[in-house]
Amino acid sequence: MNKIEELKARKDGLDVGADIPRYARLGLESIEEGDLDRLKWWGVFIRKQTPGHFMMRLRIPNGVTTAGQLRAIGGLASRMGRGLVDITTRQQVQLRWIRIQDVPEILDRLLDVGLVTLQTGMDNIRNIIGCPAFGLTPNEVLDASPVARAFTAMFVGNKAYTNLPRKFNVGITGCRENCTHSETQDIALVPAVKTSGLDEVKGFNVLVGGKNGSGGYRVASSLDVFVRPEAAAEICSAIVLVFRDHGSRDARNKIRLAFLLDEWGEARFREAVEARVGRRLEKAGADQRLAQSTDHVGVFRQKQPGLNYVGLLVPVGRVTGDQLLELARLSEQYGTGESRLTVDQNVIVPNVPDARLGQMTAEPLLRTLRYDPPGVLRGLVSCTGVEFCNLAVIETKSRALEVARALERKVPATKAVRIHWSGCPAGCGNHTVADIGLLGTRTKVDGKVVDAVDVFMGGASGPQASQGVKVLESVPCDELPRVLEGLVRFGEFDRVRRQIRMLQPTSPAPPPPPERAAPPVSTIRPDEIAEGSGKAITVSGTEIAVFRCEGQLYATQNWCPHAGSALAAGALDGGAVVCPAHGYRFDLRTGACATDAQLRLKTFRLVPDGAGFTVQE
């Protein structure tokens, strides 16, 4: 049993809520062992980058907020969070620089306006995402927001859902356009229709097993199930509970739903879901999604005559408390007091009458949060980065803005170019589905370790989903404006995606040959790795980290056995690699962990082979 499972077995994460007032009264040092992690069940996250302070993550189903909620969030951020608010790629917000003493007041104030922070971290169902233009866009098959609300009400605060093997992401949309990256979700309900006699029934097809992290992008696969809106929340619940009861609880980097599906296959998993709900499920209907997407930035006609929604770009998702207060005012003055957050970290204000559009677009706030931004800035998405995240390898948000503005000066793009930044392999910036995806790493330049990225191209979600292909490796961030200029000028991302799909197999792969020892493969040369750094390689399907320390090469498994972070991005110190996420130290020679004696890395032999080395167990 891994350490997180032991922690959950001793005490349910929700139970720490009763201890929060005492911890707030007695201070940070009073928090008992294990409860720092359990606080994540309450959306309260300690951050080593901000010693003595926490991040709080709010649950905002489908990204829908009221003016009153924005005022509450903005006011709390200004008074207790140094005025800083981040919009995430799950349509929710995060407050920074929070003291434990202030947490009870924040929770009470949020509850007053109908918001909670429950189950926004750790092994829970995270915020339900969906099309932010539900009920507004003429491109939807059905309004899916009631399903998102019903499912959220089913699991929030319910201990039946608080001990999953791993985190669980759900997207529910009735829109034809692919604005939610459904293929990256553990469960995705996407619009479909089915003929029943002479009637056409609108509902959802069910996709399962998508992910970005834990070893890379896996496109969610069809469960071959059509579900009607009134039964959709029940089916989502059944899928989650099958995962709860049958998912692995061993190595945390291999226990997402995707791995259970790889082990069982979709047919067996579907049978388990049917057994839980006690009936056979309908076969999938006709997929209604289009091979296009939208970012919701700009002025869009609603299906309601005379009304519009205005999509505002929030650069890298970061706003101030004062900006949220002003946004609340605008939503009331020009709309109906509602704002909606998007998975691209932006915001839309719905229900703006034609007669008020000119006044709204002339508001001073819209010179900062623009409805008509330039192309590169418009498509920019960034995770939190090393500034506040324990897992990140590099700074992302400030870098992303710096690079985007440099590119705008070099190549004024006429349409949006989706450039997504992820600071670590967890992939919170959705880099795998972008035109250009940037994944944080580190490299050496003139003997100095600097921020760098691996560059991916051609990622896409939707009915023709494709994973971005790595085209460049370990590019120093300072060189990115020059390097990316050519890619942005080229701009034929749709053509790249078509070429990627042509390379993908269109027929089932032949059965594997009988198991035998894999022959050694020459995989690495000493000059490929800078002294004091590591590099991830793949040998016979296994991801391995190769390090160069004091002139010697060492090979270990790449994924940290503690929480699954990529060790190749870690620092080397005295013959040990230090995990970039939580600081666990592993001996490069033996794999022994100095931080937790129960953990150990698998090590590999490097055998000289001509100019390079082969990896052997």
Provide a role label for each language-model segment.
Residues 248, 468-523, 598-617:
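Short flanking/linker segments adjacent to small metal-binding domains or redox-active Cys/His motifs
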Residues 528-617:
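Rieske [2Fe-2S] iron-sulfur-binding domain
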